Swiss-Prot record:
HAMAP family: NaMN_adenylyltr (MF_00244). NCBIfam families: cyt_tran_rel (TIGR00125), nicotinate (nicotinamide) nucleotide adenylyltransferase (TIGR00482), PRK00071.1-3 (NF000840). The lineage of its organism: Bacteria, Bacillati, Actinomycetota, Actinomycetes, Kitasatosporales. Keywords: ATP-binding, NAD, Nucleotide-binding, Nucleotidyltransferase, Pyridine nucleotide biosynthesis, Transferase. Catalyzes the reversible adenylation of nicotinate mononucleotide (NaMN) to nicotinic acid adenine dinucleotide (NaAD). Its EC number is 2.7.7.18. The gene is nadD. This is Probable nicotinate-nucleotide adenylyltransferase. Pathway: Cofactor biosynthesis; NAD(+) biosynthesis; deamido-NAD(+) from nicotinate D-ribonucleotide: step 1/1.
Amino acid sequence: MGGTFDPIHHGHLVAASEVAAQFQLDEVVFVPTGQPWQKSHRAVSAAEDRYLMTVVATVENPQFSVSRIDIDRGGPTYTVDTLRDLRALNPDADLFFITGADALAQILTWRDSEELFSLAHFIGVTRPGHTLTDAGLPKGGVSLVEVPALAISSTDCRARVAKGDPVWYLVPDGVVRYIDKRHLYRGE
């Protein structure tokens, strides 16, 4: 599951859990982006902070792990590079890339989009306010999944922290403590 995870929240975790169950996945690997190319218009928390928050949020689930593959590569993060690297590390694995419906709608604008579907099967999950559609995407290359609706976004979580509002129960407890300890999102 790729994402900025700035911060990771319960919506991400529920989506990963639902997809793992529906597709009988052995493992869900969370891959925080290093330098997300499509978010250059706004400040993004340090990659190490986003990685550590993701570790804190997923550590209790034995089916979840976190990869540094994008963070350690350096340069802008492109999904095609992530999938090429994961394929090289796991040549016999069936790779599934979990993403939000909003991101899936933009997938044909991503770098080397024609190659993406040969590297992994894409799973688009619902996000509040976004309609699921696979129109224009390769047949058999995408699955759409309904997940329990949680109207939580990382953008809202950052805004709440910046205003001094609580994010308890929106993000995992350990992530709340990490945000507080590192004074993240205070100046946004």
